[in-house]
Amino acid sequence: MYNIKDIRQKIIGIKKTQSITSAMEKISAIKMKKSQNLLNSTKPYYEKISLLLNKLLFQNIKYKHPYLKKRQIKCIGYIVVSTDRGLAGSLNINLFKKLLYEINKSKEKKINTKLVLIGSKAISFFRFFEDEIISTISGIGDTPKISELIKPVQIMLKEYDSNIIDKIYIISNKFINTMTYVPDIKKVLPISIKKSSIKFKNLNYLYEPDFSSLFESILPRYIESLIYQSIVENISSEQSARMVAMKSAMDNSKNLIEELSLIYNKARQSNITKELTEIIAGSNNIY
């Protein structure tokens, strides 16, 4: 026999939780819209500067630069972009699984790894990788500043310049749409010419003052833009994942309330029937 009082308390508790998840869903929806607006405003710049760099390199294929040179791989650096807050479904764990797979592959080839961790979830998850971690940052917020983000990344770039790290990747969640976001790994260094540049082979450029100076001025902007774009995409993925998770929690709580209400009504009806039976039996005994 179900205890009516306990069922009523459970329904009240679930309704309180439902009101909290409802508020969080609305907040996440607002933040998701803002993050998508930020993503849409930064994406054209990243695409343009990537295209420009690609054009320049394709036209100067023999140009030598440390960031273009392929090395024998002894150590790979990963810039890991996660969230600061939870309640985002499997967003972070899927990303970490992908990175662990890459790290294990490198270990099999006797290749070391170094990590720059962005977001408290990555810092917490990889806390036992002390020897691999070279820098961390958390609390970047929903509208991060590139000046703050680039500081930990510069430590990894210095290790690349010192030949300690031979290749750098950034791993984050790629935002596709509100319901879809996938772990994505982009190569930061060394820079490679994309095959799409083949259509620019007949273009000729005049450089002022010269190609080398122009390339040196564009290069840091390209790296900053790549990192910032990856982080903004991860933020959009986070807000979308949280909104979907809260909506799912709302739907589940609604179904649970309906089930408990049905059990409550049946238990109440059973109690009423029992009480009526006892009253009738008692009245029969009187007569």
UniProtKB/Swiss-Prot annotation:
The keyword Cell division does not apply. HAMAP family: ATP_synth_gamma_bact. GO terms for cellular component: plasma membrane; proton-transporting ATP synthase complex. Produces ATP from ADP in the presence of a proton gradient across the membrane. The gamma chain is believed to be important in regulating ATPase activity and the flow of protons through the CF(0) complex. It is found in: Cell membrane. It comes from Wigglesworthia glossinidia brevipalpis. Belongs to the ATPase gamma chain family. GO terms for biological process: proton motive force-driven plasma membrane ATP synthesis. This is ATP synthase gamma chain. Disulfide bonds: none annotated. It comes from the Bacteria. One of its GO terms (molecular function) is ATP binding. It is a peripheral membrane protein.
